[in-house]
Amino acid sequence: MQFTRTKIEDVIIIEPKVHGDHRGYFVETFRADKLEEFLGYKLNFGQDNESKSSKGVLRGLHYQLAPHAQTKLVRVISGRVLDVAVDIRRNSPTFGQHVAVELTADNKKQLLVPRGFAHGFVVLEDDTIFAYKVDNYYS
């Protein structure tokens, strides 16, 4: 897995290694040990969510405040989206700035969106399936 800090260093792009041949492919989509080693702290993802959307749908921007704040690890299972994270931490030097990343079923990129960020995406293909790991329960 490759981890890349974005212009907002707390937002991380994760690119898993894809092992493929004529039969298809295999990919580890999540490795807690590798992510925690990169971050320097432990995350406890306790819930997985999935949504299916049509082209043109805009989901977000959503955010949760304490005690319901969430770190999200998001990826596309089929289709593609333009995914956006906006820093809404008032005392942050990057307050109000955003990161936008195209996530697709083909590129397998994932985005780690920490607590204190608004998150959303616009769907770029019909029948896009989007998956979220979160470290706090939906409320």
PLM segments and residue spans:
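Conserved metal-binding segment of the jelly-roll/cupin
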Residues: 103-125
